[in-house]
Amino acid sequence: MGSTREFSFGIRLFLKAYPWRKIHPVPWTPLTKPLAECTVALGTSAGLSASGQPPFDDHVRGGDPTFRILPASTEVATLQENHRSTVFDHSGLHRDRNLAFPLDRLRELAATRRIGAVAPQHLSFMGSQTAPGRLVKETAPAAAARLRADKVDVAVLIPVCPVCNQTVALVAAELERQGIATVCLMLLREVAERVRPPRALCVPFRHGYPLGQPDDPAGQTRVLEAAFYVLENEPGPAPVLRELRSGYPPPPEPATIEVPED
């Protein structure tokens, strides 16, 4: 998974000293129906905005706390990225927006009936928010209300930078308070342990590459399937923290083939 070794000594010192915001108590919304009947939304911290929307403002002290709504009809390749952090590699995201906003993968999963439906609207944040007060008090509740209005059942939240790990966790907590089951991909296990999102899957990739590699639909789908495994098979109590690694999720059981008797 991601590691602080990716970063300069100065950034490592900052991350060590930073007062991570612990979620307490940890809210929990159980998954009460099969994913094949669920409406699923995405939340990205990559600072993505659609054509005609204002970009995120990289001059806001502590990070731009606003959010953007990305419609399900969005062409992923046309999204603009305005993430202020310079500590992670943006090149993969420039090549394939699905690395942080896998809307194309979600459409494919809906087409095969793995999920019930793609939500009509999705959430975009600029996740490098070192002062998350407004995010917690204003932005996350407003964003959650938008998904509730769309009758969203499940949200998958995706970070790209070190502080993004905290941002998606804080948003997930508010979504859970408002009755939406969530799972966060996490790039730093130590942040997941300190902040405590309701459900987290630590992924073995560096920052900027939360779903693996660009232009790798099969690999990106495997990551989403692992996130869905956490939702479907980890009943709590919260917080649930798992790692995507060899043996987890376990391979599917082979189908039983009935051989007719002679």
What role is predicted for each listed range?
Residues 1-262:
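Metallocofactor- and cofactor-centric catalytic cores in central/energy metabolism, strongly enriched
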